[in-house]
UniProtKB/Swiss-Prot annotation:
Keywords, in A-Z order: ATP-binding, CBS domain, Isomerase, Lipopolysaccharide biosynthesis, Metal-binding, Nucleotide-binding, Repeat, Zinc
Residue sites binding substrate per the record: 68-69, 75, 81, 107-116, 141-143, 267
Catalytic activity field: D-arabinose 5-phosphate = D-ribulose 5-phosphate
The species this protein was found in: Salmonella typhimurium (strain LT2 / SGSC1412 / ATCC 700720)
Name of this protein: Arabinose 5-phosphate isomerase GutQ
Length: 321
């Protein structure tokens, strides 16, 4: 039984891969035309489809929307019961139908023509009513479905999904859509955390900032070091400009060397240590700390004045790994 299941699964994958391998050679003038229509669309891209095509259409709409093209999915039945009112002349409709003859098209196509809405098609039948009405037709045809009964949409839905991805990625690259653009539409995701957060969003502030003055004794600096547990203390002048840092390592070296605890911390600190700019990207700051093999740093403003402190754990807790 297990061999039969494995063979069936592998056969399905092989058939789907075989059909999908034919897609690249089909991309031509219609693909370019479809991409350009979307790129120059002043409104939204409305994706529509029935059954399995509709399920894939929802994913295509979501991919377009998250990669710089305003898009949403409308079910054909809902479109015919009021949702056509959401579609305007500056919009584009991408209709998915393998047969190209979905009965809803008989009513939808004339309404789109009345509104001068550009129609794009994904279909397996290029000369179907849908194919003839569309300004650009993307060929998702298959020689056979992976279903052993040749009934359930399998290979054809894979082709549809891949063609949708190809179209979305081509449009995305043409728009110059980049990582930061992507992060702005995914603020709760890992990429959003990496690219949208600046140091000032994550840094410790107020009483949580370990700080002493240049004239503070090593003893008091040690107490401040212990109070915050950050592994360092920022050493500042009277204008709160950071002049150095006093770390656990500095304290150990000072004590091993026989230094007095009453000595000003300015003599035991590391002068001109690493500081981070409050407005810098958090991901860049984290990478700097890791490159320098340090775990924490003071945060300063554009004038070098202390505004906060941060350590690697603060980045990790924010999802910046």
């Amino acid at each position: 039984m297990s061999d039969a299941l494995l063979n069936a699964g592998r056969q399905t994958l092989m058939l789907e891969l075989q059909e999908a391998s034919r897609l690249p050679e089909r991309l031509g003038d219609d693909f370019v035309r479809a991409a350009n229509i979307i790129i120059h669309c002043e409104g939204k891209v409305i994706v529509s489809g029935i059954g399995k095509s509709g399920h894939i259409g929802k994913k295509i709409a979501a991919t377009l929307a998250s990669t710089g093209t305003p898009a949403f999915f409308v079910h054909p039945a809902e479109a015919l019961h009021g949702d056509l009112g959401m579609i305007e002349s500056r919009d584009v409709m991408l209709f998915i139908s393998y047969s190209g003859g979905a009965k809803e098209l008989d009513l939808i196509i004339p309404r789109l023509e009345d509104k001068s809405v550009a129609l794009l098609a994904m279909t397996g039948k290029l000369h179907s009513p849908l194919g003839r009405a569309a300004k650009a037709v993307l060929d998702i045809s298959v020689e056979r479905e992976a279903c052993p009964m040749h009934l359930a949409p399998t290979s054809s839905t894979v082709n549809t999904l891949m063609m949708g991805d190809a179209l979305a990625m081509a449009v995305m690259q043409a728009r110059g859509f980049n990582e930061e653009d992507f992060a702005r539409s995914h603020p709760a995701g890992a990429l959003g955390a990496r690219l949208l957060n600046n140091v000032h969003h994550l840094m410790r502030q107020g009483d949580a900032i370990p700080q002493v003055m240049l004239a503070t004794s090593v003893m008091d600096a040690m107490l401040e070091l212990s109070r915050t547990g950050l592994g360092l203390v920022a050493v500042c002048d009277e204008q709160h400009v950071v002049k150095g840092v006093f770390t656990d390592g500095d304290l150990r070296r000072w004590l091993v060397g026989g230094g007095a605890l009453t000595t000003p911390v300015s003599e035991a600190m590391t002068p001109n240590g690493i500081t981070l700019q409050a407005q810098s990207r958090a991901i860049d700051a984290k990478e700097l700390l890791m490159k320098r093999k340090i775990t924490a740093a003071p945060v300063v403003d554009e004038n070098g004045k202390l505004t906060g402190a941060i350590n690697l754990q603060d980045f990790y807790q924010a999802g910046i790994i």
